[in-house]
């Protein structure tokens, strides 16, 4: 298959070629060709596009999607799949907490403790060290997601889904229906990539609570969140006594 690793091997004219550098250089070139609608990518496989495929893909890319909708999907993945805890335990009691991504509340607000994630869509001023330290002094813990392509993957998927929804696909020529069917499969792969990228973004995130930057180096995404949340909940509840 025409995936990135195989293309690097095909282009190698020297066995001593620095494959990592070539891989990144080639990825950049392929991304530019995708942006110009000359080629497409499904998962890890690249392919040349026909004129009809180029036309449909260009219309896809021109489709506008709402930032709030993308953030809402990020919240569903984080709080619905990756970290689905609804309460934290302190002593013998369970306490509910608010779940938030950027400025979007997920679920019902309780008015108590809050766990908030900042995404690539949030304003840069929200992520300054001073602002993070200051905002996390009260009842809010803040997680600044690491730099992974979760946002771009969800945006690409949403554009495809919205484009298809706006078209009467059953009345299109069979060739166009086949292209759209392939793009729907591509959208599902983008969504899977976004979930994986969000896990990595949490594992590489910065966590702020009680006006401090809490550094937890080991563990997967859920374990890191649980550990950081446990530390902060002890700090927060201790301030009550």
Regions found by a protein language model. Give the residues of each.
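Extended alpha-helical scaffold and adjacent linker segments that couple domains
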Residues: 1-241
């Amino acid at each position: 298959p025409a995936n990135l690793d195989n293309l690097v091997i095909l282009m190698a004219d020297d066995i001593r070629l620095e494959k990592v550098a070539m891989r990144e250089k080639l990825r950049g070139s392929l991304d530019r060709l995708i942006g110009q609608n000359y080629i497409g990518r499904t998962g890890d496989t690249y392919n040349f596009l026909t004129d009809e495929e180029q036309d449909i893909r260009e219309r896809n890319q021109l489709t506008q999607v709402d930032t709030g909708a993308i953030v809402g999907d990020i919240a569903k993945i984080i709080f619905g799949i990756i970290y689905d805890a609804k309460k934290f335990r302190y002593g013998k009691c369970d306490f509910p907490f608010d779940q938030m991504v950027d400025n979007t509340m997920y679920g019902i607000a309780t008015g108590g403790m809050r766990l908030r994630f900042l995404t690539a869509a949030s304003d840069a001023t929200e992520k300054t060290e001073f602002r993070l330290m200051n905002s996390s002094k009260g009842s809010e813990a803040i997680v600044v997601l690491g730099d992974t392509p979760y946002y771009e993957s969800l945006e690409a998927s949403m554009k495809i889904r919205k484009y298809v929804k706006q078209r009467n696909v059953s009345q299109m020529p069979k060739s166009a229906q086949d292209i759209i069917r392939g793009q729907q499969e591509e959208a599902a792969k983008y969504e899977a990539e976004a979930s994986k990228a969000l896990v990595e973004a949490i594992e590489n995130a910065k966590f702020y609570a009680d006006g401090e930057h809490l550094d937890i180096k080991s563990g997967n995404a859920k374990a890191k969140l649980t550990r950081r949340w446990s530390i902060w909940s002890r700090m927060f509840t201790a301030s009550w006594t």
